[in-house]
C-alpha cells in the first residue's frame, strides 16, 4: 500500500536523445533524494533491464513494463496516434488513464505526446485546449510560470482566460505562491494595445472577482525575466517564439563570454578570478535546472522533458512531476475552474 507521500510515475524510457541510458540514471538520481518515488518504466525490456542492472537500488522502486514500439522524434502526431497503443509513450500515458500511475513523464516527441495525451486523458470540464506550461528563471526567487509555449498557435479570449486560471493554480502547486501575480503578454502595457482577444481577456480578468490570482495587467517581453509577474499568459505562437528567443539569447551570451575570456592571457586570468561567479551564472541559465513542462487542462498529469536533457535535467523533471502529484494539481484546477465559472459573468467562457 502506497503512503500519501509516494508518487507513482509512468516513465517513457525510450524518449529523448539518450534513451534508457540517460532516463534510468536519472530515475536513480531522483530516487536518491526522494525515496518515496515509485516508477513504472516503459520501453524495450532488454535495453531497460541492462541499464537497471547498473543501479540495483532502483529494483524495489521500479516495475519494468515491456513496450514493443517507440514513437520517433520526427514522427507526425497522426501516425503516432495509430501506433500509440503499443508504444512506450502511449503505454505510459495509458497507465495514468487506468489509474496504474499518478502521472506520466516523457522526453519524446512533443507533438505526439500532446496528441496521445489528449486522446487518452481528454480535456477537463471547462477547458477547450491544453496549454504547454513551464517555469522560466527570473531575477525573482521563484521564477515565472509561462503558458502557452506552443500547443496552440491561435487562441481566443476564452482560451486565454482559461489558461489564466490554470496557470495560477500551477503557480500555487509548483511554486507555493498563494495568490500569484498574473499578466498577459502584449506589445505594450497600455489598455488599448494588442489584439481584440487580448483586450477582451484583460477586461474580463480585471473585473472578475476571484482569489486564485491578482491580475496585474499587460507585460512586455523584455520584462519576462525581471520577476514582475508570477504567471504570464499568451498564445502558443507568441509563447514559443518568446521561449526560443530566451533560450537562444542565453546560449549567445554564454558563448560570447567564453570567446571574450579566451581572447588573451589577461582575459584568461580575469576568468580565473571570476570563475565562481560565472559558475553561478551557468547554473542559473542551464535549462537542465529548469527542466519539465506540463500540458495543463488534461484529466491527468503529463510532463514533458527536454529531448536533449542530461541525467540531472530528467531527474529535475521527475521531481517536478512528483511535486505536482502530491499537490493534487488536477483536482485543484478543477475546483478553481468551478469557482471561476460559477460567477454569472464568466459562464459563457466554459467549454
UniProtKB/Swiss-Prot annotation:
Biological process, per Gene Ontology: fatty acid biosynthetic process; phospholipid biosynthetic process
Cellular compartments annotated: Cytoplasm
GO cellular component, one term: cytoplasm
Classification via InterPro entries: FA_synthesis, Phospholipid_synth_PlsX-like
Main location class: cytoplasm
Pathway participation: Lipid metabolism; phospholipid metabolism
Enzyme Commission identifier(s): 2.3.1.274
Any matching Pfam family: FA_synthesis
Reactions accelerated catalytically: a fatty acyl-[ACP] + phosphate = an acyl phosphate + holo-[ACP]
Taxonomic superkingdom: Bacteria
GO molecular function: phosphate:acyl-[acyl carrier protein] acyltransferase activity
Keywords for the protein's UniProt record, in alphabetical order: Cytoplasm, Lipid biosynthesis, Lipid metabolism, Phospholipid biosynthesis, Phospholipid metabolism, Transferase
Function per UniProt: Catalyzes the reversible formation of acyl-phosphate (acyl-PO(4)) from acyl-[acyl-carrier-protein] (acyl-ACP). This enzyme utilizes acyl-ACP as fatty acyl donor, but not acyl-CoA.
Subunit structure: Homodimer. Probably interacts with PlsY.
HAMAP family: PlsX (MF_00019)
Family of the protein in this entry: Belongs to the PlsX family.
Listed name of the protein: Phosphate acyltransferase
Organism (species): Zymomonas mobilis subsp. mobilis (strain ATCC 31821 / ZM4 / CP4)
